[in-house]
Structure formats: C-alpha cells, structure tokens
Amino acid sequence: MSTERDSETTFDEESQPNDEVVPYSDDETEDELEDQGSTVEPEQNRVNREAEKKRETFRKDCTWQVKANDRKFHEQPHFMNTKFFCIKESKYASNAIKTYKYNGFTFLPMNLFEQFKRAANFYFLILLILQAIPQISTLAWYTTLVPLLLVLGITAIKDLVDDVARHKMDKEINNRTCEVIKDGRFKIIKWKDIQVGDVIRLKKNDFIPADILLLSSSEPNSLCYVETAELDGETNLKFKMALEITDQYLQIEDNLATFDGFIECEEPNNRLDKFTGTLFWKNQSFPLDADKILLRGCVIRNTDVCHGLVIFAGADTKIMKNSGKTRFKRTKIDYLMNYMVYTIFIVLILVSAGLAIGHAYWEAQVGNYSWYLYDGENATPSYRGFLNFWGYIIVLNTMVPISLYVSVEVIRLGQSHFINWDLQMYYAEKDTPAKARTTTLNEQLGQIHYIFSDKTGTLTQNIMTFKKCCINGTIYGDHRDASQHSHSKIELVDFSWNTFADGKLAFYDHYLIEQIQSGKEPEVRQFFFLLSICHTVMVDRIDGQINYQAASPDEGALVNAARNFGFAFLARTQNTITVSELGSERTYNVLAILDFNSDRKRMSIIVRTPEGSIRLYCKGADTVIYERLHRMNPTKQETQDALDIFASETLRTLCLCYKEIEEKEFTEWNNKFMAASVASSNRDEALDKVYEEIEKDLILLGATAIEDKLQDGVPETISKLAKADIKIWVLTGDKKETAENIGFACELLTEDTTICYGEDINSLLHTRMENQRNRGGVSAKFAPPVYEPFFPPGENRALIITGSWLNEILLEKKTKRSKILKLKFPRTEEERRMRSQSRRRLEEKKEQRQKNFVDLACECSAVICCRVTPKQKAMVVDLVKRYKKAITLAIGDGANDVNMIKTAHIGVGISGQEGMQAVMSSDYSFAQFRYLQRLLLVHGRWSYIRMCKFLRYFFYKNFAFTLVHFWYSFFNGYSAQTAYEDWFITLYNVLYSSLPVLLMGLLDQDVSDKLSLRFPGLYVVGQRDLLFNYKRFFVSLLHGVLTSMVLFFIPLGAYLQTVGQDGEAPSDYQSFAVTVASALVITVNFQIGLDTSYWTFVNAFSIFGSIALYFGIMFDFHSAGIHVLFPSAFQFTGTASNALRQPYIWLTIILTVAVCLLPVVAIRFLSMTIWPSESDKIQKHRKRLKAEEQWKRRQSVFRRGVSSRRSAYAFSHQRGYADLISSGRSIRKKRSPLDAIIADGTAEYRRTVES
C-alpha cells in the first residue's frame, strides 16, 4: 500500500506545477493509478521515497547564509564563485556601489563601441572607410566625417555628462559613514567598507546603507519607522518591527558585540515586499519576513536609535536589483520608420547597381576608346563598374539620413517638456504637475484605440467615507422617519459624547448610536469592536491627538469609523492590542495574524480576551466569507440583500465575521502554524493551507459600506474619448453589480445599452467555435478567414464579465491535480506523438477562443471586467495587443495596476491615495483622470501630426537633394561625380535645412487646443495611420524625385548655349553646382513654409535665416582668402560671386523654385476646396468658432459636483491588508440617455464643418 506521503507526491516530470494556469485537459490523469488500493511495486516505492527525501534536503528557497559578527565565515572557499577563468570572487557583494559605466581610460573606446552598435552609425562608419579608398570615392572624406562626428559628439557629450554625475553620486554615497561593530565596539566606517554579517547602529534621519534585519529599536514594542520614498516614491511612513527576543536582549553594545545569530534566507532578488528566512539563535528558530527587514535607500524616521544585521550589501540589495534595465517601449512610427529606412537602403543598393552597370557599359562603348580619359590603369569595364558601385553608395548615401534619429529624439524631448509645462494638467490641490516619464512615446498618444482603466482611485477619488452598515440583518445609515423612531432627527449625529471622536464623520442614523449605547443588541458592539481590532493600522499621537497610519484609505476609514462609534484603537505591540471600548480600556493578547493576499481576499486576527477565551475575527470579500460561514447563520440572506442595496448605490463593501476557538483546537492549530512560519521553502503556500483550517464555520456579524466618490470630469472625459473613437475597458477588482453601477455613474453605460454577461458570452463563443470547426474541418485554426460580426450593426452593446468567467471563457482555469501517486512508466513513440497532438489541439482551441473573445469584446461600446486580479488585467491588455494589433493605453493608481501599465503600449499613472508604485512604473503621470483627454486629444494628436509632417518632409528633402546626382550621372558617364560642392553636401543636413523642420516638429498645430477638445473626431487620423504610412512615404519619395528632376533639368537647359554679360559662356560645372544648390535650399525651405499650419516669429526666422545662412557661408567658402589658407579643401574660388552676378542665373533659380512649388500650391488649394479634411473645415471656420467660444459659453450637459452614484469596495491586491469587495444585485436608476447628448454634440459639429 502507498503511504499518505507518497499519495501526495507526483513524480511525472511533465506534470504542471500547482500554481500554474493550464488549459482544460481530458487526459489530466493519464498516468495515474486507477485503484488507490492496489499494491505498488516495492522497489518503485523505495525509489520514489528516496527521491522525495533528496528533494527535501536540497532547499531551493533559502540558500543564503549569514552569520553575525563573523566576517571570516563569509570568506570560506565554498562561498567563492569563479568570475573569469581562474579568477574567483565572493558570492557576497561588497557594499560599494558602481552605477557609472566608464572611467578615464574606457570612456572613449566603450562609448564609441556602444554607438557603433547602432546600425545607422555603423553604416556611416563603413562609408567613411570606403571614402578613404581613392579608386572608389569621388567625395571628400569630411562630407561624411563632419555629420558623423556631430552625431557621435552630441551623444558622447550627453553620455559623459550623465556618467560624471553618476561618478559623483557613487562617490558621495560610498563615502557616507555608519557605526559598525568592530573589535567589540561601535566604530565609524564608510558605507563601502560594510560587509554582510556586520551589526550596525542607525539613528534618526539616517539613510539605511544595506538591506538589514532589524534587531532592536529605542521605540516601544520594537517598532522602527522608515520612509521609503527612494524605493516606491511614497512619503508616508511605514513601520517595521523586530523580533521580540532580539529586541529584548540586543539593546546594549556588549550584547550586540557577542551576538552570534545565524540566518538562512532567500537569495538576493528584486521583490521589495517579499522576504523569507529563518533566524537560528539560542537553540531556537524564528521566522523572518519583510516586516522585519529594513531596505537600503530608506530613511529612519521618528526613531532615535535602531540596530540591524546586514543581510544583503551593495549590488545584492533589493534597490540595486530593481535598478536594472526596464523594458523599452517603441512606437508604431518607430517600427514604420525603420522599415522605411530599410526600404531606402534597398533602393540605394538597386540604384547604385544600375548606375554601376551603366558605367561598365559606358566604359566598354566610350571610355576605352577615349584617349583623354586614360588614367594609366588597364582595368576591365566590369571591374570599373564594380568600383563605381561603391562610389555611388558613397555619393547617394544621403538617401539614408544620418541625422534622422537624432532629430527625432530632439523633437520628442521638446514635446515631453510641453506636457510637463502644461498648466491645464496641473493639479494645484496637491501641487502635482503632469509628468512625461519617458520621451519616446509622445506620438503614440495620438494613436490610441483602447484604454484600460482601473476604477478605484482612477475613476473615483479613493477618499473613503464610512456611510452605511448592516449589522445582524439590519441596515443602518439612512435617514429614519420620525414615525419609525421618535428620537430620530435629520441632522448629523453628534459624537461629542465620545472623547476619541475626530469630528469628521458625517453620519445621519441616530438609531445606531442608541443601539451602541443601550447595548440591547450585543452584535452591534461586537461589529465595531471587530473593526477596531482586525487591521494592520499603526497609531501615534500628535499633540495629544490619536493619529492613524493606514496603508490604504479603506483601512483608515474603517478604523476611524470604529473610533467615532466608541471603539477606539489605542496601541499595539507584537503580542498585544489595546482598544477603548466605550471609554473602558482593554488589552487583548494577539495570538496570530492571518495576513491578506490576493488569493485569500480576507484578513483574520486571533486574540485572547482578558477573560481567557480565544476568538478569531475576520473581514473580507463576501465571496470568500460566505464560503466559510457556519451553515446555521440566520442573517445570511438579510445581509446579502443589504450587500445588493449597497452595491446598487456603488458603495464599497466587505463582510465581518468571527468564531469562538477552543483551547485544544487552537493549540493543535498553532503548532501547525509555527511549523509553517519557519518552513524553508514554499512558506506562503504552507501558511495559506494552515489558514484554511481555522477560517471555517464563521459567524456572520454584518457588512460595511464605504463611499468613494467619482472624480470631477470623469463622465465628460469618457464621453469625449468615446467621440474620438477610443474604446474604454474598465478592469477592476469590484463585484459585478458594483462595477455595472459605476459604469452608469460615469456614463460608460446608458439605459439603452444591451449588456452581455459571462453566460451570454460563453454561449456566443461556443456557437462561433462550432461554426468555425464545421467550416474548417478538423481544427478551427484552418477555418476560412471570413469575419462575421457577433451582433447586428447599430446595436449599443456592452460586456460585463467576472474574473472567473474570464478564466472559463479563455480556457485559463486552474486544474486541480489528483493526489493519486503517479508512477513514471516509459512512453512509446506513438503515445508521445498522440500526447503532443492532443496538446497542440488544445493550444489551437485556446488560441482561437481567445481571438473570438477579443473580436466579440471589441464590437461592444464598453467592456467592464470585474473581480479580476492584477495578472488577469495584464492578460486582457495583452490579448487585445496580440489579436487586434491596436495601440493600447492602461491607466491606474495602485500597485495592482503596475503589471497592466507595463503591458500596455502606453502606461499612465495616477498619483493618488495608494502610493506611487503605478506612477513609477508608468510612461506618463498626472493627478486626475480628466487630464487624460488633454493628454490624448491635444498633446497626443499634436505630437502625432508634428512627427508625421517632420518625417514626410525629412524624406522629401533628402530625396530632392540626393537624386540630383542620379540625373547628373546620365551626363557624366555614370562616373559617380557629384553635382554639388563637397562643403555643401557636408552642411546641407546640418545647417541649411535642419532648423525649420525641427521647429515644425516642435511647434506646428493644425487647430488650437480648445478646438481639438471641442471636436474629438479629429483624433481618428492617428488611429487610422492616415498621415504617415507607406503610401505617404512613396508620395514623399515621388515628390522628391520630381523636385530633383526640376532642380537638375531646368538649370541644365538654362546653361546650354548661353552667353553671359561679358560675352563668355558661364556654363561651367562649378556655376551649375551653385545654381542647383541655391535653388534647392530656397525650394526646401519654402516647401516647409507651405507645410506649416501654425506660424510664429521663430518659424519665419528659421526659414529665412537658413537661406541667408546658406548664402553667407557660400560666399565665405568661395572667397580667395579661405582658398589661400586651405587650397585643397576650398576649390570653388570666386564661383558664387561670378555666377550670382548674372541676372539670368537668378531668373533660372526663381523659375526652378516656382516650378517646384506652384504645383504643390495648386494641389493644396484643390485638396482643401474639393476634398477638405476635417481639420481643413475647422481651420476654415476657426475665426467664427473662436468667436462662439468667446461669446457663447454653453452650460455643460454633464452634472457637476457630487455624483449620486458611488464607487464600490474593490480588491486591494496588496499583501498585508484586508481585501475589501462588494456583492449584490444591480439596481438601475433611470437617467437621461447619453446618446442624446452625444447626438447633439455630433449634430453641432457636422453643422459647423459643413457650413
């Protein structure tokens, strides 16, 4: 017979781990024994048991060993790792940090190496090498070197400045001092000399030099307060608590010097809120968790002195582990721009090859027979053609713009500053400006298709107020009519009878106060007592007043409510908690705290009363609480009805319950609890299992209801974004009914919206899968690509789905593995093949079902996913990214939104009440959801339009410049001779045409910000990629080709058979080059003037200044003086003055410019007249629209002030805090439909643009 231990063990190497999400499988128990009672081969049992013992002996989680006050212990040979060949170093890092990248010797080679890893820079380096070969190059070396040095120099200077700053910062930090036990006494040493195992002393306002275990503190109850602003951006204080035994014995220097504790813990990692370890001391073991660890970068506050043991130092600390490279996000335009550069490169190769073939043919037909062209070498025509191929690669290299990427980064940097400087996105109440935390994604803000938003703190204010409650089936908090109770009044409840009341709670139900004071219903007092004792809040006193420090607004609201109703939490230690119960102080022994996590969705505390009885108090989500209630709870239905009512009013709810525990039961359970607490591996899973054993047969007390108001401007913002064809999905931890009512409150849902729930979706997807399978044969994957809509066109549909249904629909539900012993038998090839095919079919089915779900959801006008975890939020975002190829934006304010924010193309953080984790992980941040409309509809749209105009013009001007060489090659024997002076080629992209296009990319705007917000339909140009795509690219290419033809052939025709004023023919090569170059500079600068929609003095100055700069430099470079100094570099002596004094040369230039620009002007006029865009129509009427905006102020159609609908209590998803969720039925309230409002706005917009 197999033992119980064996029956719980799986040895199948292909089995999935318990916590992994796997699809449904029909062969889940393929290798399991059918009969548990069958006799198992003894040898196999023995092998399995030995393998299990071996696996237990090897501790994967806790392999980091630290011994206090013993540096030699950490220098043992088995702690040394081989770094390079025979060079070894200790696995324990020193505490010196090194964030800089270069030093005085390595800066130049390393920086150049990093820069030449970029394809564009390496390409131009190859060109520079080719230009050094005389047989190939017809261009001077400086034509490529000067632009390349400019690009490399700017980047190198930026990198040098950054690295010098890092050097200074590292030196400053490493040279900070700290007190460390050395030779039995505290001595002051530098941070860089601290080592793992050292015992250190820290004082108030000291920075923590390493990750340390808190040993003792001068504060009562071994508390230590820290500020974690450098870790997570939060300025509110957090508390840490030492072990009672270390705090008791390690207060004086002598005891600290002789402390010889031994720690086994997890290896260094980047999880800031997780730590697992065990302290072995005095023949006892003590569990360690994150609450006992002080992390490097934090600051000691409100604590005079504390002592700690260094566990991780330097590069091993958690803050350094988190300083690695973040995932680099790139925009859609980035990818498209790279593909276009590749296209240009291919065109360059093809054109160069064609011209090289032409040169080989010309050499064979003409060159070999022309004695005056003999160069002394008897090379074959094909060899000369081969050399000329590389010559044309050099001459035409400006088709691939070297300054493109630098210019793009400059424009993005400027656009980011405009976002930072926007006062209309500044929240004065909290002094919080908008912040562009990345500079590479601005134009993508103008292409968003889907917004994924958290609810609590994002759509709502996350300022919690206790409003109602249900106790023993009775609802309290509503106004009570005088007929119901003679003493009830409508005015606010007076809490002056309570000395601990804070005077801030607005409550109207006087009957609840009477119930508390009379004590007629013990459950009422028990209800508020539970709120005062079951929490993780800390208390301190400021000017004699109690001040609570809660990690979440929810927790603070509940504890404050209990305080106002007479049950004030006063103090806590590691083992006790003191509460004032209607003026009488009582202290309870805390026996265990059963912490919160996102899977448990509840928190419990076990206390011993002064009378000696043991009780468990629990609060959490109704879904998990109701599963654990005793079957004889008489008020279950009444409380459920109350939860429904609270949910309909969008109040955040949670359930409260308790149970009596017998001494024997607790003793048995506590032994398991202590064993799980010191488990070396899988500690969290072991604790959760132990928690489940005690949290059952609970007695329901009631439910709380907390108000969380909508933020200002949320409905208006959502309406405008909807008009911009942006779909909004709300992903929240709230229950279905609460989330639905929030949807109505923020106008995401309307009364004529048809809502589909999980059952409906599952049925639709099942039908679609069957149809696809029938059409496609064996697998839906091979179904014909015919898209059929799920709903009839024109229907207003919304989708509301819970996390459990999401797993069900997407085949992501966890499967429970059987506890039957699996034996590992060899499989035949046929069995492996069948198993592989089965898995492949499951993956295909899963993939097709996911795609169908995304198609269905994207047909809906709104999607609300409720009861979802942080992992599910990220999964939903990823599904839309994967199957719709749409640009996504995720916005949230809490730690549970970080994964979603990082997954989306654009992440936006709200700096709210839940700390700064979301902000620090985001690409953009601000304080209010309503600023999102300005970020997208103004800054995003402007950035997209500017970048598109910049890229189109940049490619155009480079093609117009470069292809003149192409036309010239037909007249010079395809000899790779340039059409311009070398210095003009060098400075064209650097000085003559760079500033105007940069300013257009920074300042241009088609319509004002007010009109952009007034007409959100303008936003669709970015969503549809209308302004920059391959079609636009080839139009710009064709425009450049035609411009180059005009620039070459008109001057060529003008120079043929002409005579100057002096009777001589000026048709020399140098005069021709000056004429073409002058016409080119004027044309491309005037062209950008035609492309500019928003004129400023700066734009005008840059255009005319660039032309003036060209002529000034040209006359200087063509002067005799500079030729005398540098005769080989400046060979166009006198060309400019001689050529440009001829009137017909100016006439030629003017004619060339006119022929280039007049067709553009004509096409623009016809386009705006016959096929005007939406922005063209608005520009045409902007004066009238501006007058209307000024004189006809319309009243907003949206309600302002406090909304009657409120938010519900959502998941916290943070370890250590109770999970607060609501449940109930949705009770819709009749409202004026939003469609009418939108229709009015749309009609006005159409009337405006059509008139």
From Swiss-Prot:
Molecular functions per Gene Ontology: aminophospholipid flippase activity; ATP binding; ATP hydrolysis activity; cardiolipin binding; lipid transporter activity; magnesium ion binding; phosphatidylcholine flippase activity; phosphatidylcholine floppase activity
In-chain residues carrying the UniProt-annotated modification Phosphoserine: S1223
Required cofactor names: Mg(2+)
Biased segments, Acidic residues type: 25-35
Family classification: Belongs to the cation transport ATPase (P-type) (TC 3.A.3) family. Type IV subfamily.
Residues reported in the UniProt entry to bind Mg(2+): D454, T456, D893, D897
Substrates-to-products reaction catalysed: ATP + H2O + phospholipidSide 1 = ADP + phosphate + phospholipidSide 2; a 1,2-diacyl-sn-glycero-3-phosphocholine(out) + ATP + H2O = a 1,2-diacyl-sn-glycero-3-phosphocholine(in) + ADP + phosphate + H(+); a 1,2-diacyl-sn-glycero-3-phospho-L-serine(out) + ATP + H2O = a 1,2-diacyl-sn-glycero-3-phospho-L-serine(in) + ADP + phosphate + H(+)
Swiss-Prot/TrEMBL keywords: ATP-binding, Cell membrane, Cell projection, Endoplasmic reticulum, Golgi apparatus, Hearing, Lipid transport, Magnesium, Membrane, Metal-binding, Nucleotide-binding, Phosphoprotein, Translocase, Transmembrane, Transmembrane helix, Transport
Cellular compartments annotated: Cell membrane; Apical cell membrane; Cell projection, Stereocilium; Endoplasmic reticulum
Alphabetical list of PANTHER family matching this protein: PHOSPHOLIPID-TRANSPORTING ATPASE IC (PTHR24092:SF48), PROBABLE PHOSPHOLIPID-TRANSPORTING ATPASE (PTHR24092)
Residue stretches spanning the membrane: 122-142, 145-165, 340-360, 386-406, 953-973, 983-1003, 1033-1053, 1072-1092, 1095-1115, 1143-1163
Record's keyword annotation contains Translocase: yes
Active-site residues from the entry: D454 (4-aspartylphosphate intermediate)
Topology Exoplasmic loop: residue spans: 143-144, 361-385, 974-982, 1054-1071, 1116-1142
Binding positions for ATP per the UniProt entry: D454, K455, T456, E555, F596, K619, R652, T732, G733, D734, R867, K873, N896, D897
SUPFAM superfamilies: Calcium ATPase, transduction domain A (SSF81653), Calcium ATPase, transmembrane domain M (SSF81665), HAD-like (SSF56784), Metal cation-transporting ATPase, ATP-binding domain N (SSF81660)
PROSITE patterns: ATPASE_E1_E2 (PS00154)
UniProt GO BP: aminophospholipid transport; apical protein localization; bile acid and bile salt transport; bile acid metabolic process; inner ear receptor cell development; negative regulation of DNA-templated transcription; organic anion transport; regulation of chloride transport
Topological relation to the membrane, as annotated: Multi-pass membrane protein
EC number per UniProt: 7.6.2.1
Effect of deleting the gene: Mice have unimpaired bile secretion, and no liver damage, but show mild abnormalities including depressed weight at weaning and elevated serum bile salt levels. Do not suffer from jaundice or diarrhea and have normal serum bilirubin levels and normal liver enzyme activities, except for mildly elevated serum AST (aspartate aminotransferase) activity. Display unimpaired transhepatic bile salt transport and are resistant to bile salt-induced cholestasis.
Described purpose of this protein according to its UniProt entry: Catalytic component of a P4-ATPase flippase complex which catalyzes the hydrolysis of ATP coupled to the transport of phospholipids, in particular phosphatidylcholines (PC), from the outer to the inner leaflet of the plasma membrane. May participate in the establishment of the canalicular membrane integrity by ensuring asymmetric distribution of phospholipids in the canicular membrane. Thus may have a role in the regulation of bile acids transport into the canaliculus, uptake of bile acids from intestinal contents into intestinal mucosa or both and protect hepatocytes from bile salts.
Recorded superkingdom: Eukaryota
UniProt-recorded name of the protein: Phospholipid-transporting ATPase IC
Biased composition (Basic and acidic residues): 43-52
Cytoplasmic side, ranges: 1-121, 166-339, 407-952, 1004-1032, 1093-1094, 1164-1251
Native species: Mus musculus
